[in-house]
């Protein structure tokens, strides 16, 4: 939005215009670290049941389909959770939403650690999913609303690299505590909810959200804090603005202007998420079908997680240079190629080679997509827009373990199962082609 002069002589300036001239400061780094580790916690929580699945299955004597249902329970909780937190984050703010989500997750995750039956564990994991959805909805929206325009794409992709760190923590906690019980594994994981205090101390509220709420002074406080006083604008003499939509309205997402965006991003989310999660959720079991022991499988997954980091870093540099769409299409396409090759692996060396390529490009694409999705919507509906995409992801997350569990229960081969999963990546590429480019554009 460009600058305007009102009849009263007050200059109106879009918040996005302020961020075109804002330098990257230490305050951005502090806020970024707080939000980054919130995303790490999210990945940790999603992976912990998968990594402890063999212990839980042995304790409750679970068949593959029932274990798949347990793995998917947290994602079923995230379906209503994302929709709920999408409205909350647009109404009460990004910061409060993230703090409340982390705190409530910690309590519910701790409750799941004392489960004495399969169904108690299932429902407490479901409730944990509802609670953790607030972090999921707010992380990328919150971070990109704090960043200068020139740094937004690259820095937000770095945020996505918290996923493999969360995976590695889940592997480490499970490996260290496997000899005790899965109860201790979940109990230790629940302590991550205390990170809410770090978010409270380290990150300001989003200026975009504050302006949309009419909180001019709160927005200006955040801008002064983030810029460390190094703005060319005199904030005391301007009125900040954002594009106006009905705040937190799901209906706005399905009106003529935004419906094509909502339909396309939902389609990308379903296919892309299936192409990743259907494989990740059953990777320990799939590796056992190829003859790997549990320690060998943990090592395979850990090494694969390490390969994700250069994928994120490469995608971060490339998206800032060439934009979202080109890099997203190229990376998902190559991930699909490596996925089909992984399905045909006959030796351990081939499995490592093709899986490294698969996760390098897949996770690089996820970093771009997590950044891009929030940029597609204006401020007043960014939270609910992002939450719809995440809800579709969680539907995909919930269905994928069930379907793959069904296939494995019928002794479907490794090759056919992984090829089926990789087909969804092709669908994600097709839908991505029709989305608009947002690199270098201000948020509205």
Regions found by a protein language model. Give the residues of each.
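Transmembrane-helix signature of 12-pass secondary carriers
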Residues: 2-444
